[in-house]
Amino acid sequence: MPSTYPRLSTLAQWSSAGPWQAELPHSCPHHALIWITRGQGRALIGGVRRGVGVHNALVIPAGTLFALDVGRQGFGLVFEIPPGGAALMPDEPQHLRLRDVQAQAELTAILDAMQREQNTARPFLDEAMNAHAALLSVWLRRTMIDHTDDRPARPTAAQRLVTAYAALIERDYRTGKPMADYAR
């Protein structure tokens, strides 16, 4: 259920209606940071399939077509951030493979603090969660700068085509257009 302030949940809580809820391509009205802490699997983000595993962070902007399958043994946290808030989130999906123990510890500490705050449900929870989201945003932008060498310099033509197609499907699927209209 979408919230007016950022929320943290486990992958199991996030897909509580069943694994299909995360495994089938869909989009969400809010930004999400997914932190995988156990297991491995596949993610489809913006039409591009990627392998995910332990210490991977996925940043999914609001309205991005995605699917996530980490299997039954997978575990992780999902931090959902409503768009238009204090936290600045990237416009493009990000897949960060955090090999540095310091970066892993920083992210874990931020998420642990969020979880403690959310579980105590004290007054001004919304303000506290927005402040934590802003801190996470700073950490994320710093980490993205540190990982610029990990990303390919330029996506291939096939990746650009499938990303554009996925964005078109996400934008127009509610209109009832037949598939033939998307092939033009």
Question: Where do the language-model regions lie?
Answer:
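Tight coil/turn sites that cap or link beta-strands
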Residues: P19-W20, V54-H55, P61-G63, Q73, ...
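Short beta-strand His + acidic residue motifs that chelate non-heme Fe in jelly-roll/DSBH
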Residues: R42-L44, V52, I60, F66-G71
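Append "Primarily bacterial transcriptional regulators
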Residues: H55, D181-R184
